[in-house]
Amino acid sequence: MGYGDPVDGGSVTRAHAAELDRGDALAGFRDRFEHGDGDRIYVDGNSLGRLSHDARAAVAATVDEWGGRLVTGWHDWVDLAGRTGDALGAAALGAGPGQVLACDSTTVNLYKLAGAALRPRQGAIVVPADDFPTDRYVLEGLAAAHGRELRLVAGDPVAPLGVDAVAAAADGAALVVLSHVNYRSGALADMAAITRAVRSAGSLVLWDLCHSAGAVAVDLDVAGADLAVGCTYKYLNAGPGSPAFLYVAERHQAALRSPIQGWFSQADQFAMGPRYEPAAGIGRFLAGTPPVIGLAAVMAGAGMLAEAGIGAVRAKAAGLTALAVDLHDERLAGLGFTLGTPRAAADRGAHVSLRHPDAWRICRALIEHANVIPDFRRPDSIRLGLPPLYTRYVDVWDAVDRLAALVADGVHERMPEHAARVT
């Protein structure tokens, strides 16, 4: 059962939201997450997912294995980054085996893949001007180190990236780096169309999947993607600082070489030889020792997603965000809010951005006085992250209800004007 028009043809009621929850095919997954927070409404899973019982059990089992097996555990752990990558590829990324690794952080993986892509290719690096800052920072450093132009693509603050604008910027470029889902607006790019356009221009494309993996359908192989990176602590619920992932299409693996050469990517790892020779296949994009305990949580997240099915997850994300959009129009637009997210479900991921001139103080007031946890992004956005595996329709309704009441009563006006370090 998905979200459609209000059942009474008028306002969106809490009873309607509750009816949607009763028909939710994914409802049973909610009980597999920890919710020891009373009446708190958590709508920040786009920053950090909840702890699942599956992840807790997987981590505990791995700790016990460490305690019992000690170093002999490495006979099973040595290939864990690849096995976990294959599980992610199948459940979340539309990637066949041997193309995904779970390792390092998104930032490090971006550096590795972007650096590898630049080595044999000449031309500029292209990135949207409003892309997530770490992507721009890494690419700025690589551009300086390699003597390349960093070409910024301007875009609409709400609408998805336009294919024509990206294609024009890609002309003569070596590498184009794009976010599949924009971290601020939630706008969802057309991966297949943009990939075709970029490749027609002679460039490689690297997709940042941090805000799409585990929330929307991703099909890297079918789209013809070249490279991708992403994190696992948002919609894959693997915990703070959990290992990220990288994807290198099989057709590119032999020609690319990571700029970070480590012993786990050495062709004959335990020969301990004097010279580095990269391993064949996806393993050449590893570096140091994999974080085994963290990978256990990633594997648990991939398993839950595979069980739910990305199609069902995507459908519910569309329904949850549609409810949030309708409630914005009905309850928030008259209080100074504007919608910072595309209205068409096909054009957005699993979070909704609400813009307001006093967004920071409203966000803090929600946390401190209404027991609602969203997050804030400069300059004026409150993001409601709605992970489908544990978010209910009534959670969306209640969060907006508390938000509207708080702003109407001016509670936020008592909050400090200056943002904290963590927003």
State each model region's role.
Residues 1-423:
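Pyridoxal 5′-phosphate
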